[in-house]
């Protein structure tokens, strides 16, 4: 079960984005976050998945627990391995390139030398299906496989 209790997120030490957010999501339950632009939907998901950039905001109060264990300070990769992830709707891939080339091209964005290979290996470890299809043309992947990519 995912439990969020009294979550508060502040941007730039002054802008209160989330205040008092509490929710329990049972295993297997499907939940939708609805709200106007700027309501905090993306911030909530980024806080849960560990992707809240420290330059964007800080969790200043509250707890985030999954199956009884705190995940608030956990590395995003460990959160994914525990079964929590955010899948974005849009797919931006190079359909004419291989899976391998797509992953390597994506790795060059704001990366230091050597980090591309490390990032590539990490993704291949997280998504064995992509590893099995690394030489395939990305445009021939299923929709779900394209989202993984």
Where are these regions (language model features)?
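Short beta-strand immediately N-terminal to the Walker A/P-loop
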Residues: 31-32, 86
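Short coil-to-helix "N-cap" segments within the ABC nucleotide-binding domain's helical subdomain
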Residues: 58-63, 109-125, 132-139
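ABC ATPase NBD Q-loop/coupling interface
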Residues: 51-52, 63-81
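ABC-type ATPase nucleotide-binding domains, specifically the catalytic core motifs of the NBD
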Residues: 12-13, 31, 52-55, 74, ...
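The feature captures the beta-strand-to-loop junction immediately N-terminal to the Walker
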Residues: 34-36
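Conserved ABC ATPase signature
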Residues: 96, 137-141, 145
């Amino acid at each position: 079960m995912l439990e969020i209790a009294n979550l508060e997120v502040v941007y730039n030490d002054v802008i209160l984005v989330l205040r008092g957010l509490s929710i329990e999501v049972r295993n297997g339950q499907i939940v939708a976050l609805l709200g106007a632009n700027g309501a905090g939907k993306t911030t909530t998901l980024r806080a849960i998945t560990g992707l809240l950039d420290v330059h964007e905001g800080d969790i200043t109060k509250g707890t985030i627990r999954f199956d009884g264990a705190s995940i608030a300070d956990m590395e995003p990769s460990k959160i994914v391995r525990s079964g929590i992830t955010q899948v974005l709707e849009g797919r931006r891939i190079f359909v004419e390139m291989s899976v391998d080339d797509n992953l390597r091209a994506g790795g060059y964005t704001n990366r230091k030398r050597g980090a591309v290979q490390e990032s590539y290996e990490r993704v291949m470890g997280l998504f064995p299906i992509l590893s099995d299809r690394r030489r395939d043309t990305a445009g021939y992947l299923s929709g779900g496989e394209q989202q993984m990519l």
